[in-house]
Amino acid sequence: EYKEGSRKISAYYRETDPKKLAQLDTIFKQVMASLHWLEDYTGVSYPFAKYDFIILPGFQYGGMEHTGATLYNDNQMFLSEHPTPDEELRRTELIAHETAHMWFGDLVTMNWFDDVWTKEVFANYFAACISEPLYPDINHQLNRIKTFTASSLSEDRTPGTTSIRQPLDNLRNAGLIYGQIIYNKAPVMMIKLVELMGEDKFREGIREYLNTYAYSNATWNDLIRILDNKTAEDLAAFSDVWVNQKGMPTIRFTQKDGKLQICQEDPYHRGITWPQRFHVTLCGEQRDSILEVNLTDSLCTLPLPFPVRYILPNTDGRGYGLFIPDSHTLPWLLAHWQETADDTAREALLMLLYENYQAK
């Protein structure tokens, strides 16, 4: 049992190892920190009578967000005597994820299982917001592209890929819609949504959403309607492409007459474009430079500030899709990618090469 002010939390467990049980104080404090953060962010006090948790041996999931009795897997809560920073981060993220579900999934529940992904994308997004500042020495952008982007691309490149939101006519088939797209592409989309409208406006919308639909049901479109009123951006159009359509764009780069042309194509020929932002690194004889690209249409033309030898797409890993460099850059990149000093850029370029290989 752990008390902080008027709040009391109880833990139930089978573990008897004193060294592992000594971790309970850290676990309790992380639960409390997640509760405080979510209350402050949402403006909504913890919405249920209690927050107790049960640490189960051999539990098949990392956690399960039952109100008043959250379930956790013992191996993910009781760590080894000398855990790595990544193991500690995963535990913090798990606690934050399940705690976020108290607001997103329990306080407001999806109307039907075709929107089951919404509670997962909220939990993943807010778990990152809570956890990442606590581990400043970890490259979180690198982790995001290794986890979310790489995993979702592995499915999105295949003929069997699906949209994030999928129709479900019978509850017995609900298990079929879980996978890389729900758990990994949805967070990619959410990060882009927040980037598009701005963090402050997003937070305003989240507060209105929770207050409007507390202790009831809501759809993703209900949220988008609220968020759409907070910004001049067309979030309905953004959502239709990123949430309702399957697949990923093919983005080609060419250089001509001192200009960079970026062409976005839909492999399914539906005439849609995926709005997104990413960095392009320009490599010249004397210097390099980074361009911030805001891709909103099928064709984007940008002036090059100096003579450029190589154009490296998506070097910050924020972009999503199959990035095809110009014919001069691709063979050079294949021979020199490992020389890139920045870890995030090196991973993003390696993933670019891998996706180009898979597309052959």
Residue ranges and their predicted role:
Residues T158, D200, N217, A232-E233, ...:
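Low-complexity, intrinsically disordered regions enriched in charged/polar residues
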Residues G5-S6, A11-I272, L353:
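Hydrophobic alpha-helical and helix-loop surface patches within well-folded domains
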Residues L235-A236, M248-T315:
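Beta-strand-rich binding/interaction modules
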Residues E1-K29, R309-L312, D316-P325, H336:
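Non-catalytic architectural context of zinc metalloproteases
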Residues E1, P136, D297, H336-E339, ...:
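Short loop/turn hinge sites at secondary-structure boundaries
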